[in-house]
Amino acid sequence: YHKLKKVLPIIVNKNSWIKPQFVIERVLTKLKENDNLPALLYVFSRKKCNEIAKQISIGLFEEDSKTPAIIRKEAINILRKMPNFKELMILPEYEEIMRLNEKGIAVHHSGISKPFREMQEILFKKGYYKLLVATETMGVGVDMPVRTVIYMSLLKFDGNTFRYVHPHEYAQQAGRAGRRGRDTKGRVI
């Protein structure tokens, strides 16, 4: 406490803060080393979900993993069942999603086109992703259990003002950690 008390004014005065990308990548590296992936990263803004996912520069698969190629092939097979398959494949959103998917990252929020959101839900359930960056809509209704739940913040905008996540919301969201029948415990960061 005393060391922090001395250092904090220096950090504030010099406007020196650790970048969220650095913290997220360090946390993900530790989770990967300790076999605590897949993880769900809650971000309470669609725009921030996309930004954070794009900023993650580390790959979450093993170096010689064939999973990125499998993801692309599986994604095409899923989308091929859609009537507008060819149109979906040429959208910039598709390539953006695939770039993230091939690093083991998926983004899930209401701003993602429904076919791509459903595709990522299927691929997540098959175990292809290591990180799901999502808004709180992921906490309700979609069954995608993970080993670890990470919060970027416990503050969220409720339409009028910023407030802390209510206990029942936290319990619902954090309850994703620990896969029933597979994990003895879940982690919340």
Describe the residue ranges of each PLM region.
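Conserved segment of the helicase C-terminal RecA-like domain
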Residues: 144, 148-189
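Inter-lobe coupling/hinge region of RecA-like P-loop helicase motors
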Residues: 34-37, 103
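Residue-level preference for the first positions of well-ordered beta-strands
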Residues: 38-40, 131, 187
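Short linear interaction motifs
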Residues: 17-33
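H-loop/switch region of ABC-family ATPase nucleotide-binding domains
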Residues: 135
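Conserved C-terminal RecA-like helicase domain
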Residues: 2-9, 25-28, 42, 46-131, ...
